[in-house]
């Protein structure tokens, strides 16, 4: 199993920005907050100090997490791909044969998935089922509610 984490360019850049913000802004601020809380005296009953230390732990943990993800990131370049096959990063419009409705999903990495924004993980049942299929293919997907059948009516790389 590969340790690479597939990411869209947008997601990679967003993670980089979050890391920069945490290092440049949040880390110095929490260090200042700890110093200020320490100056209030007794640390054993100092809620401000405890809160600042907890926040520092969260920030440092998130920094490590982001550094690890970015080090293992594989940015998927969709430039020049013909929109005839579903791959990671594709935006796919499906026709649900049961409900007779169209639905559009962008296939993204696990960290990027947000169903409210129409972004599904490449490891989700629908994402896994779609990858590798072509325009006009019929795809059956086992979901918790049963089996869904979709027809791929459009593939775009945005």
Swiss-Prot record:
GO terms assigned for molecular function: DNA binding; RNA polymerase binding
Annotated coiled-coil segments of the chain: 1-67
Keywords noted in UniProt: Coiled coil, DNA-binding, Transcription, Transcription regulation
InterPro entries per record: GreA/GreB_C_sf (IPR036953), TF_GreA/GreB_CS (IPR018151), Tscrpt_elong_fac_GreA (IPR006359), Tscrpt_elong_fac_GreA/B (IPR028624), Tscrpt_elong_fac_GreA/B_C (IPR001437), Tscrpt_elong_fac_GreA/B_fam (IPR023459), Tscrpt_elong_fac_GreA/B_N (IPR022691), Tscrpt_elong_fac_GreA/B_N_sf (IPR036805)
A single GO BP: DNA-templated transcription elongation
Domain of life according to the entry: Bacteria
Transmembrane feature ranges: none
Listed PANTHER family: TRANSCRIPTION ELONGATION FACTOR GREA
HAMAP family: GreA_GreB (MF_00105)
General function of this protein: Necessary for efficient RNA polymerase transcription elongation past template-encoded arresting sites. The arresting sites in DNA have the property of trapping a certain fraction of elongating RNA polymerases that pass through, resulting in locked ternary complexes. Cleavage of the nascent transcript by cleavage factors such as GreA or GreB allows the resumption of elongation from the new 3'terminus. GreA releases sequences of 2 to 3 nucleotides.
Family as reported in the entry's similarity comment: Belongs to the GreA/GreB family.
Protein's UniProt name: Transcription elongation factor GreA
Organism: Trichlorobacter lovleyi (strain ATCC BAA-1151 / DSM 17278 / SZ)
Taxonomic placement: Bacteria, Pseudomonadati, Thermodesulfobacteriota, Desulfuromonadia, Geobacterales
Gene name of this polypeptide: greA
């Amino acid at each position: 199993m590969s340790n690479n984490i597939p990411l869209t360019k947008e997601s990679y850049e967003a993670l980089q920005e979050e890391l920069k913000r945490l290092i440049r802004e949040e880390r110095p601020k929490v260090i200042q907050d700890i110093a200020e809380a320490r100056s209030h005296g007794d640390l054993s009953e100092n809620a401000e100090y405890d809160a600042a230390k907890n926040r520092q732990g969260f920030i440092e943990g998130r920094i490590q997490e982001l550094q690890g993800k970015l080090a293992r990131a594989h940015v998927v370049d969709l430039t020049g791909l013909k929109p005839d096959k579903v791959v990671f990063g594709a935006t796919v419009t499906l026709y649900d044969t049961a409900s007779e409705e169209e639905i559009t999903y962008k296939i993204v990495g696990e960290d990027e998935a947000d169903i409210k924004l129409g972004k599904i993980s490449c490891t989700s049942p629908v994402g896994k089922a779609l990858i590798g299929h072509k325009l006009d293919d019929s795809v059956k997907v086992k979901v918790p509610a049963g089996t869904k059948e979709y027809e791929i009516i459009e593939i775009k790389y945005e």
